[in-house]
């Protein structure tokens, strides 16, 4: 029992999240300064939304979304995928040979012109938040509610 335990897990988690947010803000600034993306309208708010989404699914705060983080994201969206499909998704988005994709890869995919599966996933998540229109017959009204 010579190990020392860090009993301040919440504080350490907060520090890691702050460091992660700082790294992501630096990358966002690079994209804001890049003339290639200067024509995108409302770029700062898009980058802020992408940052929140990326931080939500980067479970281990290592700067990359791995296969388990992607699996969690897909299941949360109600679109579970097989291990092979997840590997293909990562290979499509990632610029390197690893089994993760970085925030820069994520931004290039989201701001790029090519269509990718993750772009559609985020679009479906936005649609899921919209209120569904009621179907079927309207509810019965009382006489006092009639015009």
From Swiss-Prot:
- Where's the EF-hand domain? 45-80, 81-115
The UniProt entry's GO CC annotations, sorted and at most eight, read: cytoplasm; cytoskeleton; cytosol; lamellipodium; nucleus; phagocytic cup; ruffle membrane
Name of the featured protein: Allograft inflammatory factor 1
Recorded source organism is: Bos taurus
Function, as annotated, reads:
May play a role in macrophage activation and function.
Q: Show the GO MF annotations.
A: actin filament binding; calcium ion binding
> Sorted alphabetically, which keywords does the UniProt record give?
Acetylation, Calcium, Cell membrane, Cell projection, Cytoplasm, Cytoskeleton, Membrane, Metal-binding, Phosphoprotein, Repeat
| PANTHER family in alphabetical order | ALLOGRAFT INFLAMMATORY FACTOR 1, ALLOGRAFT INFLAMMATORY FACTOR-1
Q: Write down which residues bear the modification named Phosphoserine.
A: 39
Lineage, broadest ranks: Eukaryota, Metazoa, Chordata, Craniata, Vertebrata
């Amino acid at each position: 029992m010579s190990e020392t335990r860090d009993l301040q897990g919440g504080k350490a988690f907060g520090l890691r999240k702050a460091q992660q947010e700082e790294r992501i803000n630096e990358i966002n600034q690079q994209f804001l300064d890049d003339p290639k993306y200067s024509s995108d309208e409302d770029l700062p708010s898009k980058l802020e939304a992408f940052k929140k989404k990326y931080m939500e699914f980067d479970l281990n705060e290592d700067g990359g979304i791995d296969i388990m983080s992607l699996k969690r994201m897909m299941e949360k969206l109600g679109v579970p995928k097989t291990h092979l499909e997840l590997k293909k998704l990562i290979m499509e988005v990632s610029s390197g040979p690893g089994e993760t994709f970085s925030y820069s890869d994520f931004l290039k995919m989201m701001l790029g012109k090519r269509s990718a599966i993750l772009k559609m996933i985020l679009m479906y998540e936005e649609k899921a938040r919209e209120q569904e229109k009621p179907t079927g017959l309207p509810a019965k009204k009382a006489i006092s509610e009639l015009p």
